[in-house]
């Protein structure tokens, strides 16, 4: 039998959304609505459901939090520091989105 500090890590996605208005590059942030970071600015994202891939979860969160659909999305990094989230063990798969 094995004993792990974090036997069931959660998986989340974050979307770094880039937009270009012809002169400047912009990044879209959303205001967090729940603790522990309520009121803070963050990249749109959230927890992956058990029946979806990371990309499906990223697209779902993107639509839920921003209303965006049909944008170009590409995975670019995985954040896995065991202590990066005070709530629980979380692994985040990050995507960049071009609009």
Annotated model-derived regions:
Residues 1-3, 34, 76, 92-93:
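Generic intrinsically disordered, low-complexity segments enriched for polar/acidic and small residues
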Residues 2-42, 55, 70:
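N-terminal strand-loop-strand
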Residues 9-11, 55-59, 67-99:
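Active-site segment of metal-dependent pyrophosphate-handling enzymes
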Residues 44, 58, 62:
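Hydrophobic alpha-helical positions that pack around
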């Amino acid at each position: 039998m094995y004993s792990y500090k974090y036997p069931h890590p959660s998986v989340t996605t974050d979307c770094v959304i880039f937009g270009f208005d012809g002169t400047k590059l912009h990044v879209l942030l959303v205001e967090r609505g729940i603790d522990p970071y309520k009121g803070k600015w963050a990249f749109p994202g959230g927890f992956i459901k058990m029946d979806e891939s990371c990309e499906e979860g990223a697209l779902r969160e993107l639509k839920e939090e921003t209303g965006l659909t049909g944008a170009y999305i590409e995975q670019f990094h995985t954040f896995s520091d065991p202590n990066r989230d005070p709530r629980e063990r979380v692994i985040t798969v990050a995507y960049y989105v071009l609009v």
